[in-house]
Amino acid sequence: MRKTALSLSRLWFAGALLLAALSVPAGVRPAEAGRGNDELVLVEREIACNTDPAFYPGSNHYVKNGAAELLFKVDPQGVVQPSLAEGIEQADPHTWRIRLRPEGRFWSGKSINAESVVASLERSRRTNVRAAPFLEGLSFRSLDNWTVEVTTKRENLSVPLSLSYMELCIINADAPHTSVETMDMSGMYRVVSFEPKKRMVLERNPNYYGEKPIIGRIVHEEISDAETRVLAILSGRADIVMHIPPEHMAQFDGRKDVVLHTTPPASTETVYLNLSRPQLRDVRVRQALSWGLNRGELVLLGAEGRSFPVTTWLGSNPRYRDSGGGIYDHYDPERAGALLDEAGWKLEKDGLRRRDGVVLSMRLMTWGPGKAVGEAIQHQWTKLGVAAEVRHGDYSLIQTARETGDWDALIEGWQTFGDEFALLSGQFAPKGTANYGGYDDAETNALLEELSNAGTEAARRELSMKVDARVAERAPCIFLYPRPEGVATRADLKGYVDHFRKFENAINAQLHFE
């Protein structure tokens, strides 16, 4: 029966792939090996749903496919570099001045001057909810045609880092952006046709001010099913496929025609704990749940061995890989058991821990690719004497549970690279948007206040690591590993640059086929 089911599954996916190929409209042919540098097919889990980049899933897809540009971009080493901007200098603790490229032009030919940059950023502030937090506390004005002055509410805020966020692409704010004909961006490729949530075709922008791309046309397609995405690259139909989950990576082992890129992203797979639950109010219980996890085993079972353990939230950020300081640096079920004993949760003959007749229980909610790691956590917590349960389902179930407060633990992964104060306060300040469990710790809050006023990069780093360590010690969350996700490229495609920020990085001017 297993072989029959597998065969039927393969037939179904093969059929889906064939239907996808047949659905390509006139003028857009599937990728073919050895076709030269005329066309590249980029496939990912989802693409833009609107010609206006303010609409979800946002402008990162336009940055990824070469249509849109950011003022600054983070390179693979984690260093912020000028992109559409020519440079930047800090005038005082609250003031920065961005120099623009006089040669910069939108697709329409309109100059990308200081007024147009300010207008674009203010449009993002008004219309893009994902961009707004990165513009909070920033004000913009044009000093002259090619200089934008940025004033910050916080001292020594890293403006280049904030403006490198993937939702802050610079567009012509005077254009309607309601159709392919009216959208006006600045990238090396220009959108020529668009089927929302299906396919976008882009052609080389002949008037691009920067380095001209080698490949003439990009076909950007959405394939939501992971197995069908894998088949797209293995069959040669696609040239770059994003979002390869760990459970499918073994299919690339030994392949000579495909390269799998697995640079860990700056995103930490995290177990968020609901601190309003009676059993989780005691820090000793939370610490025990963390000491009682074998993270090495979780990496094998939940990430197919394609990641590495971390014990702090910033541990997935390449700038903070040394964060941790010995916190939960090994699997220690004995220590976990001792902490639970100390907290009054005694192990009884049936293998469960009780206090005052109440069983120590945990209900863990997972979604998407989190089922395997959730079940592994359930097994490890059960060995501690916890009555652990996993509920796997659609993400909407987690959202509903958070709104009602009816949850013990849930798994999510957030980006960890960016302005440290914005990121850490969003996760661990009392009113942080991702502080799901209601963590409110006086020492953490004081450290965050110091971080908000840190005057140097060295001070920001030191304080960020202190916040990170304090949070890990108090254990409102349990940190597991960088969430792995692969990118597959054809072996004859050269010039692809793997990046820990995969959301906005795929197409570059140097890509070419050999």
Task: Label every PLM stretch briefly.
Residues 43-92, 99, 119-122, 184-186:
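N-terminal lobe/hinge region of extracytoplasmic solute-binding protein
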Residues 177, 206-251, 378-395:
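Ligand-site clamp/hinge motif
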Residues 89, 93, 132-174:
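Surface-exposed binding/hinge segments that line
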Residues 79, 155, 161-213, 217, ...:
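Gly/Pro-rich hinge or "lid" segments in bacterial periplasmic/extracellular proteins
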Residues 45, 134, 208, 241-339, ...:
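Local pocket/hinge segments that shape ligand/substrate recognition
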Residues 86-127, 149, 279:
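Aromatic- and charge-enriched surface segment that lines or borders ligand/interaction sites
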Residues 45-62, 84-85, 110, 158-168, ...:
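A structural "hinge/loop" feature
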Residues 195, 292-322, 334, 369-378, ...:
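Detector for C-terminal structural segments
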